Regions:
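Conserved helicase RecA-like core
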Residues: 1-232
């Protein structure tokens, strides 16, 4: 990670003077997490004449700072810009706190691949355990898992051995699994870009998909603002 790299640079163990190609992935996510100052410090130590590639789901203000400062005469490539866009249906489902577990279990048991998103690692682990306890095969994906467990669970989901994946936002970034029929926001995300990233796991490559957000009474105003920001 960039923090560890900066530590090694500060100790004199790593020198970036001879770097010819620099790749910045998930730039928008690093901006959201407040990591851009560290990224800039790393880039400042690479040769200005080298090749730099930046990958981002969005090009908003935070990412644009990197573009203007470090990319000279940049060329923009939009992945799948001409690909057919599938139909994505968005639904809000009002539930009480007492009903939430039963509703999530019913959604997870529906035919087809389903991804349920939670805000926290603990929430993902707890929900996975609850689903398995109800006889619904499910795997979890979050930051508390080691790499072997992450790979094993994702492979099981990818190959159809398990059709329900419970994930956190950060762990699920970069997941590319086709034919996800349903995305469930078990916990509404904190901001609209996370909502769009989560929802984008379905309706890919011309396929249709459904997105359901569970809303408890105390979340109504928060979710209404979220939908407006996401232009849903």
């Amino acid at each position: 990670c960039h923090g560890r790299l900066l530590d090694l640079m500060g100790q004199g163990h790593v020198i970036l003077d001879a770097i010819e190609i620099t790749v910045i992935d998930e730039a928008d996510h690093m901006a959201d997490m407040g990591f851009l100052p560290m990224v800039r410090r790393v880039l400042d130590k690479t040769p200005g004449q080298g090749q730099r590639m930046l990958f981002s789901a969005t090009l908003d203000a935070g990412v644009d700072v990197l573009v203007k400062r470090f990319l000279h005469s940049p060329v923009v490539h939009e992945a799948d810009s001409s690909a057919p866009v599938g139909e994505m249906e968005h639904h809000l489902l009002g539930v009480s706190a007492a009903e939430r577990g039963d509703v999530l279990a019913e959604l997870a048991a529906a035919p087809g691949r389903t991804i349920l998103f939670t805000r926290t690692k603990h929430g993902a682990k707890k929900l996975t355990k609850q689903l398995i306890g109800r006889g619904i095969p499910a795997v979890e994906l979050h930051g508390n898992l080691n790499q072997n467990a992450r790979t094993r669970n994702l492979d099981a989901f990818h190959h159809g051995l398990v059709e329900t994946l419970v994930a956190t936002d950060i762990a699920a970034r970069g997941i590319h699994v086709d034919d996800v029929a349903l995305v469930v926001h078990a916990d509404p995300p904190a901001e609209h870009k996370a909502y769009l990233h989560r929802s984008g796991r379905t309706a890919r490559a011309g396929q249709s998909g459904t997105v359901i957000t569970l809303v408890t009474p105390d979340q109504r105003h928060e979710v209404a603002a979220l939908m407006r920001a996401a232009k849903i």
